[in-house]
Amino acid sequence: MPTLTATNSLSTKLATIEPHIGNTPLLRIEGFHDNENVQIFAKLEWKQLSGSVKARAAYNIIKNAILENKLTPDKILLDASSGNTGIAYATIGKELGLNVTILLPENASSERKNILKSLGAEIIYTSKFGGTDEAQDAAKELAERSPEKYFYADQYSNENNWKAHYHGTAEEIIHEKPQLDYFIAGLGTTGTFVGTSRKLKEYNANIQTIALQPDFALHALEGWKHLETVTVPKIYDETIADRILEVNTLISHQYIAKFYEYYGFPISPSSAANIAGAVQLAKQIEKGTIITILPDNADKYGDVIKKII
């Protein structure tokens, strides 16, 4: 059994990490549509610990697991990830002195694999054909087989995933753009969309929340879910989205090049997909302020970026 001192030590270390989570800047997205009455803004989520939006959920999951004595120094943090959450777990885990094991689809980018290895995480690869669904199943099986060994974070079912955005991302958006009209974001674990939208709806019921998903099952937007053909995350609340728009992978990739040309630095495929969705929405409405999320930059997607830019 872990000692109370050991658990308290983790809590103390957590306090030093928290200032580096969230509070990301908001960027006005210009040059991609012609409607002067519509403004698009995006949160630059790589401007925090571990370099992606997933730092928010990973930190909140770990923090609450430690406070509830579910994650102790003698247990391994276990979860399935397409990359970014795994990197966030590994980054925070390294700071806390915790061991981390990630179930990762084998087609994850080489950069993500290398980052996870450099942070000391154990990687167990699953089939590229099964995606994160297969990785989730494998993680669950491993946790059930050795419950004394692992804390299974289960980001797709863990309420602390969406709560990180309810208490963090949404509050920041309300502070930065209190008069927003639309929030639009892609669906992966669905935590970002669910948590942010839930809080925004409580703040102002007139705010429209639009979910984005790939336009068909065989897509190349890693981490995103095509809800009709995959296991829907337990934390997803279908009543929250006013609409669901579909985004094409190739069109999304075009926005990587467009963004680079306009702003001078590249972004990830999922960030470009959110911009593509926001622009699609901008062309459908007469006026309004749209807020979206740029989950990460292009640092972990070299192979994709080289083909586009």
Where are these predicted regions, by residue range?
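PLP-dependent amino-acid enzyme catalytic core
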Residues: 1-309
